[in-house]
A protein has these predicted regions:
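Catalytic core segments in nucleotide and nucleic-acid processing enzymes
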Residues: 2-221
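Nuclease-adjacent, charged terminal/linker segments that flank catalytic cores
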Residues: 1, 224-235
Length: 235
């Protein structure tokens, strides 16, 4: 299944690159010096697998592909990484391989600016997802507040959810294993995590996000089990 290969690529990225061998004829690889480009590429593929977008696949990404549909380089600056537009809402996904305390300095301003621009562009709710191998607590604090002043000093409260790649991978797998691979499940997670951001500090919010991921996965699994039982009883 394509989604399983996508999850395997994510696992390689979490490890910082490497190879995964299925058999002698099937090997996937993330070159260690190309992890930023591959992170954007695999999150793009994950978005296409979840599907239901109203914009075209090439409109979602800002990076270029080679003849084998592998990433040539990461997207340039000036705009967000992945714009996934659905019928009722838009999710802007930003990714980084940065894990140090410099993460907030490099990503805090541009991510908020890109989400702000998207809020002004789309005539529908816009949600941000920030995905990194590790989320620095200062980055989480910036997105917890989510404040941005647009042109004309218009104050915006942005919804940006910071997730580790491991958390996203686990949620992604659960969506497919339970038959809930749809963008609404991502929005549910974002909205659930945002409910607590005003009453928690950054370390507590990071812990709550981790708990929320597990709770949402558990809910999907329980619903799948109850649906199976109902189907069996009907038969």
């Amino acid at each position: 299944n394509q989604w399983k290969e996508i999850a395997d690529y994510m696992e390689l990225l979490i490890k910082g690159g490497g190879k995964h061998k299925y058999d002698d004829d099937n090997v996937i690889e993330v070159p260690k010096d190309e992890t930023p480009a591959y992170l954007e590429w695999i999150l793009w593929r994950a978005s296409l697998a979840i599907n239901h977008m109203v914009n075209k696949p090439y409109e979602v990404r800002g990076f270029k592909l080679d003849s084998d549909f592998l990433p040539v380089s990461a997207a340039g600056g000036g705009k967000g990484d992945l714009y996934c537009e659905f019928s009722d809402f838009t999710i802007l996904t930003e990714v980084t391989m940065s894990t140090s305390s410099r993460q907030e300095a490099m990503e805090g301003e541009p991510v908020r600016r890109h989400v702000s621009d998207a809020v002004l562009k789309y005539d529908k709710p816009v949600y941000g997802m920030f995905i990194a191998v590790k989320i620095d607590t200062n980055t989480a604090e910036t997105f917890r507040h989510g404040i941005w002043y647009a042109r004309g000093d218009i104050k915006q409260r942005l919804d940006i959810l910071p997730l580790t790649l491991a958390q996203y991978r686990k949620y992604f797998i659960a969506m497919f294993e339970t038959g809930y691979a749809k963008p609404e499940k991502l929005r549910e997670l974002i909205l659930l995590c945002e409910t607590k951001r005003d009453i928690l500090n950054a370390p507590e919010w990071k812990t709550y996000i981790s708990t929320a991921v597990e709770e949402q996965i558990s809910g999907m699994e329980q619903h799948r089990c109850s649906t199976k039982k109902e189907n069996n009883s009907v038969m």
